[in-house]
């Protein structure tokens, strides 16, 4: 029975490793989350990707998550992750995987380019766990956004409600009044009120998909 359990456990570990590689996880992420040797993970990565795992350190700057566009993307992922964790139905790494898939789905729905890689999303959660990054609620839209722990700004307003001037440089705002409707199940995943998600294309949330900083 023990042998059977160990075999099934190994199968689950490899299945998870395959998912992580397909989502773009770096080798360091795989080593942290999967109980498989580095040598076997390297061979698995090469088999799935056709190339050796990239070398070098993981992204290590929390400041990246504070710039305008990355902050919006990171905050969307974080809201999905926290929603799934609150349900208590999946392990932490499974919540990360599911939240990232939801993030990718949502970004593709609004026609925006992916900004947050899986490895950066995973790294951001480590910054949050260590207290280097925190989240605050925007006083305008009620969404939860990533901030630095030493950011002393009060009455916080997010980058969607008050985008920086450079965000619109060289790009004309969309003027169509056609609403972007978010699926109900996805509305439940992000901590922004549903009414705030179904606003005109030229409203702050739609700007995310119509501007290039």
UniProtKB/Swiss-Prot annotation:
InterPro entries: FlhC (IPR007944)
UniProt cofactor(s): Zn(2+)
Domain of life (superkingdom): Bacteria
Record GO terms (molecular function): DNA binding; zinc ion binding
A GO biological process held by the record: regulation of bacterial-type flagellum assembly
Function summary: Functions in complex with FlhD as a master transcriptional regulator that regulates transcription of several flagellar and non-flagellar operons by binding to their promoter region. Activates expression of class 2 flagellar genes, including fliA, which is a flagellum-specific sigma factor that turns on the class 3 genes. Also regulates genes whose products function in a variety of physiological pathways.
Subunit structure: Heterohexamer composed of two FlhC and four FlhD subunits. Each FlhC binds a FlhD dimer, forming a heterotrimer, and a hexamer assembles by dimerization of two heterotrimers.
Full protein name: Flagellar transcriptional regulator FlhC
Protein species of origin: Cupriavidus metallidurans (strain ATCC 43123 / DSM 2839 / NBRC 102507 / CH34)
Name of the gene this protein is made from: flhC
């Amino acid at each position: 029975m023990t042998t059977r359990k160990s075999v099934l456990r190994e199968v689950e570990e490899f299945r998870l490793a395959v998912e992580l590689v397909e989502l773009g996880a770096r080798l360091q992420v795989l080593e942290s989350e999967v109980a498989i040797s580095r040598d076997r993970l390297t061979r698995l990565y090469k088999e799935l990707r056709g190339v050796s795992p990239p070398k070098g350190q993981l992204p290590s700057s929390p400041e990246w998550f504070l710039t305008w566009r990355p902050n919006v993307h990171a905050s969307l992922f974080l809201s999905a992750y926290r929603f799934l964790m609150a349900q208590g139905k999946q392990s932490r790494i499974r919540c990360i995987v599911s939240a990232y898939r939801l993030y990718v789905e949502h970004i593709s729905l609004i026609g925006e380019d992916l900004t947050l890689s899986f490895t950066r999303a995973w790294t951001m959660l480590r910054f949050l766990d260590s207290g280097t990054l925190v989240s605050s609620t925007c006083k305008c839209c009620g969404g939860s956004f990533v901030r630095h722990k030493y950011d002393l700004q009060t009455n916080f307003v997010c980058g969607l409600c008050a985008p920086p001037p450079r965000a619109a440089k060289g790009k004309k705002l969309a003027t169509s009044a056609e609403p972007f409707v978010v699926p109900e199940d996805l509305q439940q995943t992000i901590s922004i009120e549903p009414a705030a998600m179904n606003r005109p294309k030229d409203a702050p949330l739609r700007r995310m998909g119509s501007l290039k900083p």
